[in-house]
């Protein structure tokens, strides 16, 4: 019996030692997460995003971003394939393959699809489907996690590099890399600018905890989501920045330009990919607890909780409207566009199809 107790004691010491000292990939810092107010006020729960119609994307998954161009819908995907969808017939074809992990996408003035590819950098896809790299480095450092982009009136492409420490390709998946950046919270993300006139890339501003969705405002500033802090920033091309939304009820992902409001104001659509994690918020000031969590099996770590939420805001961050699905039936919605055909198309990190709903 004594031997059994000694054996159990030794095992307990091994487990304690493992949870306390085993090396992990992150070196977390303390911060203070704001109190999660939940779905109240402007975010009061509704079911207006429920029962989305689904458009087939074949055997790929994760239609991360969506654009409409000349009546056709284009979506990116986790495995690098770009699909062209006929929204009237619900048919699709492979338009291009980046051989990476295609995330954000916009159309430039020449009809090229500009892609933020987490593995490859900033790419251009010609109308013939030819893929070329615009940039994959800045100031001698690799662009490790190109995430989202928008194009200014002068043609400059502003795009996010979500993490310079946890590259999507080096870590293995976009999701795994994003979780490491958020758990560590040192803020290695940045906003970059690529000028196609002289093929130069520069850092606009850095220090973000997973810099994510990017959208151009009419005054030339850039709206950018910072996923790890539940914030939206308004950043000028010279790097001057201010927070226009704080303490969102979930993790903001993509942001896209929306239709003008009745009074002429600009609007933008933000996708909230997951509810906030109470455990992460409660342990925001406890780096050691987050280190211990990283030593646990992945199934025991904080998990994303799907809750469908698209938020429409004005350029100052005031909430205009929300579309919600508390059931999260369409999983991990990353964002949305309101297209010329009267539909709102909803993208996703993990769904096997593209969601849409007819707007009244």
Each predicted region: which residue ranges?
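Sequence-structural signature of mature extracellular/luminal beta-sheet repeat domains
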Residues: 2-360
